Amino acid sequence: MFCLLLRRSAVHNSCKLISKQIAKPAFYTPHNALHTTIPRRHGEFEWQDPKSTDEIVNITYVDKDGKRTKVQGKVGDNVLYLAHRHGIEMEGACEASLACTTCHVYVQHDYLQKLKEAEEQEDDLLDMAPFLRENSRLGCQILLDKSMEGMELELPKATRNFYVDGHKPKPH
């Protein structure tokens, strides 16, 4: 098998063959060689099952109609992507890049102190969220740990960007 090394010319918008080599294992290849990877969806970690019972964290989502959905997550799961895995209607339009408030949730007061303190960027976004409460957080910024066992997350009645043109949120 051969490995072709190409250099792209910015001037002529073309590629020039630099050398032809026998392919070597990935850790021996030059830095400018082309590598490809398998595409991954956002929240890939959340789509994996817990490896042991020690990792399991049980939480409950309460949707805008009051329907309660108990979910079994694991330590390190992102609350937004975990909701997507279990078909809970939490949009997450910016895909956890801290650019919207569509994953806005209300955290039970008992569990608020167990969460990491919100960073300034999250607080700034929450200021723009409709139906803001003192226990409001962005779901994309909450990572589960064992201290959150039994936590309840309530979804607000509406968020900005939600159901635009009849859109129903789906995992990305």
From Swiss-Prot:
GO molecular function, one term: 2 iron, 2 sulfur cluster binding
Ranges of residues in domain 2Fe-2S ferredoxin-type: 57-159
CC terms in the record's Gene Ontology section: mitochondrial matrix; mitochondrion
UniProt note: phenotype after gene disruption: RNAi-mediated knockdown in the whole body or in the prothoracic gland results in delayed or absent pupariation.
Pfam family, one: Fer2
Annotated localization: Mitochondrion matrix
Key word Cell membrane present: no
Keyword Membrane: no
Required co-factors: [2Fe-2S] cluster
InterPro entries (UniProt xref): 2Fe-2S_ferredoxin-like_sf (IPR036010), 2Fe-2S_ferredoxin-type (IPR001041), Adrenodoxin-like (IPR001055), Adrenodoxin_Fe-S_BS (IPR018298), Beta-grasp_dom_sf (IPR012675)
Binding annotation for [2Fe-2S] cluster: 94, 100, 103, 140
Keywords assigned by UniProt, alphabetized: 2Fe-2S, Electron transport, Iron, Iron-sulfur, Lipid metabolism, Metal-binding, Mitochondrion, Steroid metabolism, Steroidogenesis, Transit peptide, Transport
Main location: mitochondrion
Similarity comment: family membership: Belongs to the adrenodoxin/putidaredoxin family.
Protein purpose: Required for ecdysteroidogenesis in the prothoracic gland which is necessary for larval to pupal transition.
Classification via PANTHER family: FERREDOXIN-2, MITOCHONDRIAL (PTHR23426:SF65), FERREDOXIN/ADRENODOXIN (PTHR23426)
Protein name: Adrenodoxin-like protein 1, mitochondrial
Origin species: Drosophila melanogaster
Gene designation: Fdx1
